[in-house]
Each structure stands twice: as structure tokens, then as C-alpha cells.
Amino acid sequence: VQLTFDADVEAFRAEFVGFLTEHLPTQAQAAERPSSTSHVPEWSRRWQRLQFDHGWLLPGNPPEFGGRNANILQQFVHREELSRRRIYHCFNPQGVGIIAASLLSFGTEEQKRRWAVPILRADKTASLGMSEPGAGSDLAGLRTKAELVGDEFVVNGQKVWTSGAHDADVILTFVRTDPNAPRHKGISALLIPTDSPGLVRRPFPSVYDRDELDFNEVFFNDVRVPADNLVGPLNGGWRVANGSLGHERTLMWMAFANRLEQLLEDYRPSDEVNADHYATIVMDYYALRLLGSAALGKAASGDVDVAALSVLKVFGSEAEQSALRHALDAAGADGLRDKMLTAPYNPYAPDLFTASWFARYISSYAGTIAGGTSEIQRNIIAQRVLGLPSR
């Protein structure tokens, strides 16, 4: 199912499809996703640089930063074509889509030159340091502290669930710089190079792929960071965190919708009971598309509805989890043994049996946790949509 837009947006889509037709490498189509940013094949770096040079890496960026000043609807059709065709986009999506975006919005010209451009051109990789023990979905509860001493910050504390930190050149780290300020107002954002003395990274496996080390604990022991690495104003980290994720959240629902669409294409039950389950997935898919297109329309007019995005996050992540549960039930024991348990998890795989429904089902639980748990999102919905008290 493809939404149709005005002629200028569809012309933008056609231009991007033409670029893909001419330049897309076969490896990106075959979805040979690199398993780690430290073992990235050269074709992947070349493909990312080619997109940067042609303005297709992040079309919403200015041309000097790999884009073409595209509006939100044009960015939508760009993302839609990538997802619908199951195309490998870039090897460091967090660095490209969040850290570099943060620097373009809040960074200095020197920070953009030193960090944003190399990240976008695949010369450097970046990770995001938010979650901490005891402050997973609650950024305002973070305790990692940074004290300004002369022209340096001295950082002490710990982060956890830091994706890709073991391979990253820099971590955009959120720290507490004013312990006496209200929780949301004493936070700052720092660019901390991973080769800084006192910074220790400890990768650990996830339940859905124990051979791939992606998550990390990161420890800061008197790590000295130049004051010039402050992103945005001192104690203004809350605004940096929310601003850098703004458009990403607006388009996040597409990932859930496209994975549901892939499931509908690959899962075709023949019996009546599972046909009912299939119908439920179809209804969830269309409901998600309608909710998402409504939020997209608001964003196009400059109105980013945070509560509506929370609804999309909860509904999309839980609909995907439910759909995969139905698919596993339909496959039965033989399907689990013969076709699913042996396949590695690969979200870009050309079909869901290759991707392993079982591995994808396990990983779907991360979708209800990462980026703010369903419980946190329901609190936002209760307070901002329903007007309920916080206690």
C-alpha cells in the first residue's frame, strides 16, 4: 500500500527511484547487512558516500551535509522507497540519523566540520549515550555528572544499552551539569571521543543474537572533555535530546508499518483460524498507516504532536509483536525447527523465513522498550491526550 501525494512530492519520489535504478549496488539489494561497524565492507562505505554526494543520504539536510533541503513529505517518500524495497541504507543509522542530526541542529560550525560530515560520509561512527542503570527510559533521571573545571568537563558515571559504542569514534553523551536544578533542566550534551583516557567500553550480547555484540556498558572515570565539545547551551541538553529525535520520531512508525507489510506478503495462512489472525494483522496495518499519515500531515504544517507520536510508538511496536506471535503459532513446531531457529536475524532480508520469524519475534520486545517503553508512552498519552493527573 502506497500513499499518493501532490505532483511535486511524487516527482521527488521518481527522481529518487531513478537514482536507485542507476546506482544501487547489488549488495545493498541483497541485504548483506554488515554485522558490525568495525567490520564494514568497503562497498557499504562507498554506497553511503555516493548517497551523500548525490544528496540522497538524508534528503532533509542541506546539500553540504548530504541532502537537498527536502520537506517532511519528501523525506517520507524517500524513507518509504528504501523500506518498501528493503534496501540497505547506511551502516551507522544512529550516527547518521540522530547524532549528525543533533549537530546540524545544535552544534557549532567546528563540530559540524569535525564530526557531522565525517559521520555522514562514513569516515567516522558515532553512538548515543542516554540510558543508565536505574534511568533507562527516564532520561531526566540520569546521574552521570560532568563538572566544568577550567576549559574542560570532568565526567564520571556509567551508561548502559549503548548501541555500537565499542565501534564508535565518539559518543554523544547526556550528563548532569547542574545537580541543583530541576531534573529536566540540569542536563547537558557532550561529544566524548571514545579514545579519551578513563573511558571504558564493555560490549555484551543480546538475547536474539548472542554472537553479535552490539550493546555496551560505558564507564566514565574522570574523563576530561574539552568545553568546546558541549552541544547546545550548558544545561540545555533536554532540548537537544528532544529536538534531535523530532523528525526521527515522526517517521519512526514507518518501520513498524513496513515490517507488517513484509509479514503480510510472506505469511499466507490457508486454514480458517489463522486466516482470522491474518485479518487482524491487516486491520492493524491499515490502522497504523492511517494514524501515521495523520501525524505526517500535522508535521508537514509544522505541528509535531508528541502525544500522537507516543500513540504510534505504542500501537506500532505492539502490533508488530502480536503479528509475529500469530505467525509463529501458524508455523508450528516443524516450522520453528526447520526454517526459523537456524536463520540469523537480518531485518533487511528479502523474506521473513531468511530473516527468521523467531529471531524477529524476540527482537520485537526491544521495540516496546527502546526509545521509551510502552509504559512511559502510555503515561504521556494519559497526561497529554486524556488530561489525567500524574499521580
Segment roles from a protein language model:
Residues V200-L290, G367:
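Glycine-rich beta->alpha junctions and the first turn(s) of the following alpha-helix
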Residues Q48, F52-D123, G164-V170, E248, ...:
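Internal helix-loop-helix
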Residues V1-F91, R114, P118, D271, ...:
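Amphipathic, small/basic residue-rich leader segments at the start of a protein or domain
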Residues A122-M130, F174:
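A short, Trp-centered hydrophobic/proline-enriched beta-strand micro-motif
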Residues V9, F16, L251-H326:
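Extended amphipathic alpha-helical segments enriched in small hydrophobics
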Residues E152, N156-R202:
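A short core secondary-structure module
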